[in-house]
Amino acid sequence: MPSVKIKENEPFDVALRRFKRACEKAGILADVRARECYEKPTTVRKREAAAAVKRHAKKVQRESKKFTRLY
C-alpha cells in the first residue's frame, strides 16, 4: 500500500495528487478492476493473445512508417 507523508504547509490537494500517482504506479486500481469479477482462464488467455496481436501490428506499422521516403 503506497503511503504519502504530508509535508509541513503542504495543501491537501497536492498530497492527494501524490497519493493517487503512487497508487497508479503500484498498479492497485488496475489490480482491483481485474479482480472485480471472475474471468475464466480461457477468456484471460484469449484477451492477452488479442492484445499481443494488436501490439505486434502496431509495432510493425511503426517500423514500416520509419522507412517511408517522402522525396
Swiss-Prot record:
GO terms for cellular component: ribonucleoprotein complex; ribosome. GO terms for biological process: translation. It holds the Pfam family Ribosomal_S21. GO terms for molecular function: structural constituent of ribosome. InterPro entries: Ribosomal_bS21 (IPR001911), Ribosomal_bS21_CS (IPR018278), Ribosomal_bS21_sf (IPR038380). The keyword Ribonucleoprotein applies. It comes from the Bacteria. Keywords: Ribonucleoprotein, Ribosomal protein. Belongs to the bacterial ribosomal protein bS21 family. This is Small ribosomal subunit protein bS21. It comes from Cellvibrio japonicus (strain Ueda107) (Pseudomonas fluorescens subsp. cellulosa). The lineage of its organism: Bacteria, Pseudomonadati, Pseudomonadota, Gammaproteobacteria, Cellvibrionales. The gene is rpsU.
